[in-house]
């Protein structure tokens, strides 16, 4: 009788776990077991298992069995909560060697426990043996008596009997990861990484887009432009400096020079131009060798366009330019006397030091 009562209790309280306070549900089971033992005293017939089956039946429906009501009061549970969590129209038959139940008036009768030694039990299907509550999926039956933690005692009979199923809450297994699976997850999360990130276009630098900008070339061009502006300012200054002074013409115009002297001046100019053309074109320069495309303004009065070209490899020799400008001035004023013109301007070529003269570079806005 103890074994059959324990099977029926496990089936009933399986509906109450996780819905009502667990401690009170356990007390409800203990009180119900005690009350059922008292009720079945003198009404247990192993020789005739089905005798008194209606008296031993536990019914929960519109009318609740008095044993269920008494156990609810002793455990502190509300009878409405117990009836609301149990199946509607539940009937449990506790008979010797067999425990069965029915849900609903027209529902099928299912067997929870049956003994192998019973002649009627041998005719039943083996799948019915040691069955448990199919509605309560959170409980697992333990068929091994050695590993059973149930408080159900051993069968009181000498022959072998089926062990009552013990129901235990199903514990959630922790997530386990291998090295490969954990590497594919986010740290601190069990969600997999989003593979859509790899489809995003990465930021590209200007070099990868074809905009190859060389900083050294920019610095060289900036230095060349500043030097060109300074040289251009020097050329203009050398041309504009002697111009304000000749505005004060002498009181008496000088007589025209004789023809032999004019011819001598033309010969000197031609010799000077030949010397300039014979000078080597490739010399060391402080400018960048890539600055060959810059053209200086024509600083000579009667020079070709090639004389205005300043080679990148030639040195910054300003002496030929300055002296050529001086001779061009004489060529423009061919009718003036050289001595009186120089004395009027107070212009001395020996006093000017071109190598030591410091110039202020002119920066263009």
Curated annotation (Swiss-Prot):
Post-translational modifications: Phosphorylated on Ser and Thr residues.
Short name of one Pfam family for this protein?
Answer: BTG
Show the segment(s) annotated as Required for interaction with CPEB3.
161-220
The ranges of region (Disordered) come to 144-171, 233-287
Checking InterPro entries in the record gives:
Anti_prolifrtn (IPR002087), BTG-like_sf (IPR036054), Tob1/2 (IPR015676)
Motif segment (Nuclear export signal): 228-236
Give the Low complexity compositional bias ranges. 144-160, 262-283
The similarity annotation says: Belongs to the BTG family.
Partners and quaternary state? Interacts with ERBB2. Interacts with CNOT7. Interacts with CPEB3 (via C-terminal RNA-binding region); recruits CNOT7 to CPEB3 to form a ternary complex required for mRNA deadenylation and decay. Interacts with CNOT8. Interacts with CPEB4.
Q: What is this protein called?
A: Protein Tob1
Native source species: Rattus norvegicus
């Amino acid at each position: 009788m103890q074994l059959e009562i324990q099977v029926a209790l496990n089936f009933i309280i399986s509906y109450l776990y996780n819905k009502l306070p667990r401690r009170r549900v356990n007390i409800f089971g203990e009180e119900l077991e005690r009350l059922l033992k008292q009720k079945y005293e003198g009404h247990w017939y192993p020789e005739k298992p089905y005798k008194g089956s209606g008296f031993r039946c536990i019914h929960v429906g519109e009318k609740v069995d008095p044993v269920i009501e008494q156990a609810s009061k002793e455990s502190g549970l509300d009878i409405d909560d117990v009836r609301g969590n149990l199946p509607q129209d539940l009937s449990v038959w506790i008979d010797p060697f067999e425990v069965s139940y029915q849900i609903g008036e027209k529902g099928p009768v299912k067997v929870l426990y049956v003994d192998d030694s019973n002649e009627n039990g041998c005719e039943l299907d083996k799948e019915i043996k040691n069955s448990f509550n199919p509605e309560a999926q959170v409980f697992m039956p333990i068929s091994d008596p050695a590993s059973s933690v149930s408080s159900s005692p051993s069968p009181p009979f000498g022959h072998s009997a089926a062990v009552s199923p013990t129901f235990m809450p199903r514990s959630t297994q922790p997530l386990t990861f291998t090295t490969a699976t954990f590497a594919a997850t986010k740290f601190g999360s069990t969600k997999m990484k989003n593979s859509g990130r790899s489809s995003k276009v990465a930021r590209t630098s200007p070099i990868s887009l074809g905009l190859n900008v060389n900083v050294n070339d920019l610095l060289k061009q900036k230095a060349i432009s500043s030097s060109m502006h300074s040289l251009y300012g020097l050329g203009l200054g050398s041309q504009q400096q002697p111009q304000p002074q000749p505005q004060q013409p002498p009181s008496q115009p000088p007589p025209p020079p004789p023809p032999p002297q004019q011819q001598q001046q033309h010969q000197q100019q031609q010799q000077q131009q030949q010397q300039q053309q014979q000078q080597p074109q490739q010399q060391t320069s402080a400018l960048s060798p890539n600055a060959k495309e810059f053209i200086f303004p024509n600083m000579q009065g009667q020079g070709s366009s090639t004389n205005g070209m300043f080679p990148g490899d030639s040195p910054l020799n300003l002496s030929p330019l300055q002296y050529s400008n001086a001779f061009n001035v004489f060529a423009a004023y061919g009718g003036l006397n050289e001595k009186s013109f120089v004395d009027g301007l107070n212009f001395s070529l020996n006093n000017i030091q071109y190598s030591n003269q410091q110039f202020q570079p002119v920066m263009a806005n």
